[in-house]
Amino acid sequence: MYAASPARYSTLPYHRCGKSGLMLPAVSLGLWHNFGDTSNFENMRLLCRTAFDNGITHFDLANNYGPEPGSAEKNFGRIFKEDLAPYRDELLISTKAGYTMWEGPYGDWGSRKYLLASLDQSLKRMGLEYVDIFYHHRMDPNTPLEETMGALAQAVRSGKALYAGLSNYNGETLEKACAILDELHVPFVINQNRYSIFDRTIEQNGLKETAVRLNRGIIAFSPLAQGLLTNRYLNGIPEDSRVRTDGRFLKESVITEEKLAQIRALNEIAAARGQTLAEMALAWILRDGKVTSVLIGASKPQQILDNIAALNNTTFTADELEAIDKASGFYKE
């Protein structure tokens, strides 16, 4: 019988999500990878236990996480039932809908029919009465924004979600969505977007600035750029790397000599700071207080502990930030 560590709240700081009442741990656990049916279940349990024992209260899922789609929610539901159910009121569980989930015209994008049906399915797979956050997973160019936001409002009013979130939106669409949700009195509190030293899209498309101005939180996924911002690729591509074993999310063509040189230069900056490259990459995201939480993935429990160590130093000098920009190709005169 699992008993959570009595010291679990002594490790991590918790950040307020925008101006809401919701607090997120500075580091959250994402179940995008390593929780599908191709992964070892006992290892999944260890990952979740290690996370919670060290103050990671937030577990982030989506309907399509796997492989196969739905399997991450199903496996998390089993972990919840066997280990975490007594701690439900200490957990922040999120899921999403927006990508292809089932065949036909009603299993994708942002219609009211799809989002509300998907949420019901997600709750059933996880064995939950509600999720804490329900996200629309991506912008839908063909469905009226009012319909999609109305579905999020219905999810909250029905008690099946406590808060609404948006994922992969840009600044302009976020602002429009926020106005609709405010008018509907829906607690929209958070944006989830890809963000790393190598991917600064949210700085370029206005999302980061808009979220801060509107007092909404941000949680960053892929903070290590699918493993590029670790020591895994300092000497080229390892045979057991994700590139070799699962090329869906990180293509071998991305790892050029130029990219390897950037990784090595960033690693030297990290070493000078007394950090690993991964620690520095996570700290960089949290450097200015504008990102509420950083979403990590893990295949081993030790990786969770290593990532938490990034919080030991999230302060950067102007020279360090300039060096990181130069090394990663983002420096502007």
Predicted segments with their positions:
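N-terminal small/glycine-rich loop or linker at the start of catalytic domains
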Residues: G18-G36, S94-G107, Y130, Y135
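N-terminal binding-site loop/beta-alpha segment at the start of enzyme catalytic domains
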Residues: M1-L91, R157
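Alpha-helix N-cap and loop-to-helix initiation/capping positions
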Residues: S39-N43, S71, N75, Y106-Y114, ...
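Short, acidic/polar
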Residues: T38-A51, G110-M126, L174-C178
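Active-site groove signature of glycoside hydrolases
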Residues: L123-T143
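Acidic-and-aromatic substrate-binding clefts and catalytic sites of carbohydrate-active enzymes
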Residues: F35-N40, N64-A72, D140-P144, G171-E172, ...
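Conserved beta-strand positions
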Residues: L29, L61, T95, I133-H136, ...
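Beta/alpha (TIM)-barrel catalytic core signal, keyed to glycine-rich beta->alpha loops juxtaposed to Asp/Glu
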Residues: Y2-T11, T143-Y331
